[in-house]
Amino acid sequence: IQFAIDELKLDDDMLVIAGDNVLDFSLTKFIEYAKGKNTSCIMRYYESDEKKLLKCGVVTIDESDKILNMTEKSPNPATHWCCPPFYYYTKSDAKLVQKGIDSGCGTDAPGSYIAWLCKQTTVHAMEMAGKRYDIGNLESYEKVKSEYKGIEY
């Protein structure tokens, strides 16, 4: 992310999404939510499967969706709120990416930046409006091909 910021000389709000995910919903509501909160934001969804929780970022939120804590791949998830890799960074928070890296955030793990950022400033987590499909291997790709029906607005 910092590479893109530097190379493209980005100086604006940013929408960052992992390329191995497909969504069945529009991102318009997410962007509107983030702009309404006037903070950086992520998405979250309720994950009931304990095994899947061990493989994702998990957030604890308050009644206003403010992130109180985020952990990546915790052996003891604190909640069932899983965070897929969909991030909206405000312009001011995008400028902190290098500081986050310097503080130990992984350059190939954007969730670690959110975990760090929510301790520096307010970050919110919007409940996902639909389903996401994670394409991690050929089997999941084939499953998505058979199930995916496109974006619902």
Task: Indicate residue ranges for each PLM-predicted region.
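Catalytic-core segments of class I nucleotidyltransferases/pyrophosphorylases
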Residues: 22, 31-35, 66-134, 138-153
